[in-house]
From Swiss-Prot:
Keywords, in A-Z order: Cell outer membrane, Cell wall biogenesis/degradation, Lyase, Membrane, Signal
Residues in the signal sequence: 1-15
UniProt-listed GO biological process terms: cell wall macromolecule catabolic process; cell wall organization; peptidoglycan catabolic process
Recorded family membership: In the N-terminal section; belongs to the bacterial solute-binding protein 3 family. In the C-terminal section; belongs to the transglycosylase Slt family.
Domain notes: The N-terminal domain does not have lytic activity and probably modulates enzymatic activity. The C-terminal domain is the catalytic active domain.
Catalyzed reactions per annotation: Exolytic cleavage of the (1->4)-beta-glycosidic linkage between N-acetylmuramic acid (MurNAc) and N-acetylglucosamine (GlcNAc) residues in peptidoglycan, from either the reducing or the non-reducing ends of the peptidoglycan chains, with concomitant formation of a 1,6-anhydrobond in the MurNAc residue
Name of the protein this chain belongs to: Membrane-bound lytic murein transglycosylase F
Function: Murein-degrading enzyme that degrades murein glycan strands and insoluble, high-molecular weight murein sacculi, with the concomitant formation of a 1,6-anhydromuramoyl product. Lytic transglycosylases (LTs) play an integral role in the metabolism of the peptidoglycan (PG) sacculus. Their lytic action creates space within the PG sacculus to allow for its expansion as well as for the insertion of various structures such as secretion systems and flagella.
The organism's taxonomic lineage, starting at the top: Bacteria, Pseudomonadati, Pseudomonadota, Gammaproteobacteria, Alteromonadales
Class of this enzyme: lyase
Topology within the bilayer: Peripheral membrane protein
GO MF assignments: peptidoglycan lytic transglycosylase activity
Amino acid sequence: MRSFLLILFCVSLLTGCQGERVDAAKAVETQPKTQLNVGTLYGAQIYVTTGQGLAGFDYEMAERFAKHQGLTLNMQPYPTISDLYQAMRNGEIDLIAAGLADTQSRREQFRLGPPLYYVNQVLVYKQGAKYPTDVSQLDDNITVISDSSFIETLAEMQKLYPELVWDQQWDKDSEELLAMIARDEISYTIADSTTFEINRRYMPELRAGPVLREGQAVVWLLPPNGSDQLMSDLLSFWHQEKRAGTLAHLNEKYFAHVKRFDYVDTRAFLRAIDSRLPKYRDNFVEYAGDLDWRKLAATAYQESHWNPNARSPTGVRGMMMLTLPTAKQMGIDNRLDPEQSIRGGAKYLSDILNRLPESIPENQRMWFALASYNIGYGHVEDARKLAQSMGLNPSAWRDLKKVLPLLQKRKYYKQTRYGYARGSEAVHYVDNIRRYYDTLVWIDNQNQQLQDEVMEAQQQTAEKQSQSEISAAQPN
């Protein structure tokens, strides 16, 4: 009898513990979700750290999606696509937002969200090499990233060209492979069109060969199971943002201005960053105020190529190419003095920004201000009124850049208060400054990364030296 009671007591203890574990598991399951965990890759158009914080098409969309769900965003960059896949399988992330294209292989492994934008796959080689007209008869292998959409494209092409071969890199990303092309370390790679267009501003030696696949949708990846509600929320969010013009705005912000490319100008700008910018950088930083100093520096390069003695037949002079009336208004005595010119240009640009209507979003105000700096505030206001009369959004840069060139046509400028203006030049002016700015941000990031690597190496060396000294001091 005593043994029976002892067994019954032990069973009741075990049952009670099991019940506590079940209740604890239920509590975890029912605990309200507070953050959206998103996996990503580093990339200028995906996720990047700038002096003004985080940026990137996927980052901005993920931030909006988290807000749409009432969650905070936890966006974690992973080293490779393979690592992203594994993190998804391990349940570490809710979705992947990393500029990845829609492929059959990914459809078989994950659920794919709606299209964010479209890209082409292009074969990339270095300037000076023969244009690769026939992919099946290249003089060297193609090097691509493992688990990328390019593998699927090459596998399909290999069915037609059995002799086609390629190398896979497991520890590199697209930007690293493009840099290897520029350094003559590899002969060919494949990149999506947006990545190529963005990176050739920093590596102007890159050249685009034939398009291997056209119009691939870039999508987000969701878990294959248990993601019905997340997919429903994502589709609702996508329709909302598309109607609001967010997708069009982000496409314009990250991709529109990089399509135009001038090899000679890009090379000259990169040289000027080394030879001229260091002389004036402190002035740009000092007088930028609330502006990003790199936008001010990019504007100065567009105006004068950082030449303090620049002159124009129209009467503008100096680093920031100020008119005499504007210089007087800004309190500038000598337009050819670089410090005064930068101070005056910064103040003038700041004044324009303050004049702009509040309806213009913060992230687009600079483009409106730069257009005004170029052709005058009144002409930009004329273009905004024209945009409104045409059913376009007068406070969206993507719409205003369509209307500005119309100020050169009599049919339109006769309707305006200030008349004719070279609006197409204003569009090119702003696009150029945006490209120069992006390049300055990229170079700053590269320099910071190099400094971090040097500091890490020094720290490791110091730790090894300290351990050696401790070992040497210990008695045998």
